[in-house]
Amino acid sequence: MSQSRFKTFKDLPKEHLLGTGTAMCAGCGGLEALHEIYDILGEKTVIINAAGCMTLLSVYPYTPFRGGWLYTSMASAPAGAQGVRDAMDILLAKGRMSTAEDMETVVLTGDGAAYGMGLSSTSGAIERNLHFLYLCYDNEGYGNTGQQTSGATPHAARTATNRGVVGYPGFKKDLFAIWAAHEPAYVASVIGAEPLDLARKVDLAKNIHGPRLILALAPCPTGWDFEPEETVEIGKLAVQSGVWPLKEYRNGQIKHTKIPKKRIPVEDYLKRQGRFVHLFEPKRNDSLLQEIQTRVDAYWSRFE
């Protein structure tokens, strides 16, 4: 990561721009990340918000956003961003908007849209080299409708649609790699529990032209089944166990920005969440736990 104005925690914004009193769940990891990201982006943003948890932020006639906000269907937020960006570019070209009035075009979606329903429109937007920032809060399920399985659901997790003794039999898609395969301007994974790493990446992305993704793991007390006050700790465990690598893609290169000095066992992360309780009770499922650990170890063996 290039030199950043955020060198220590003292450099982080002291106050949040995003308003309070929203209808979000207590301890929402997505809202935690959004607060931090919005502080860096500033008020001159237009949020194109796909259907999902975060649409509860702007319940008419109230909104916590200080800039523009547009609601779209789950699959069409990048198309909405194209319209917003095109409209502003036309106004700029005709002199009806000054460069000082120009605004950042930001798509805001959950993993249901980012990994699944909206992936085709996202791919098209990247191929058109649309100048937009895509922000995904990844709570690893369709959280707004009861935590059904999504393309981001991890192996063996219990969801509303996979309640068996082994949980979800499939595997989480690698959205970071899918975006990187398009050769966009920038891709970064972040988490609200690591605010300095997050701030540096968002600040960098803000000053890059083209399609950019900020992919934020969003620990979800409601869907993952843990207490709201544990959100930050769960987030740190995701990083320390190696389950959620913090990295960035730029100019064809991938760089890890925070490598755990000594990774903790993955089960230390899993056992704190009710969605994985079936791996430990009433009988420990050593084979599934080892399978999950082996996949994490295999990932890091390529970089260590």
Positions of PLM-derived features:
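Cofactor-binding active-site loop characterized by glycine-rich and histidine/acidic residues
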Residues: Q3-Y134, Q147, A152-H155, V165, ...
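Conserved thiamine diphosphate
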Residues: F9-L12, E101, S150-I208
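Electropositive phosphate-/nucleotide-binding environments in soluble metabolic enzymes
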Residues: E15, G27-L31, M74, P78, ...
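Structural signal for hydrophobic packing residues in well-ordered secondary-structure cores
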Residues: Y38-T45, R85-L91, G170, A180-E183, ...
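Short gly/pro/ser/thr-enriched loop/turn and capping motifs at secondary-structure boundaries
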Residues: M54-T55, N139-N144, P221-G223
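Catalytic metal-binding/acid-base residues of hydrolase active sites
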Residues: A113, A193, P219-C220
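Short, conserved beta-strand edge motifs with alternating hydrophobic and charged residues
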Residues: C136, A188-V190, L213-L217
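Glycine/aspartate-rich loop-and-adjacent alpha/beta segment that forms the canonical ThDP
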Residues: L198-E304
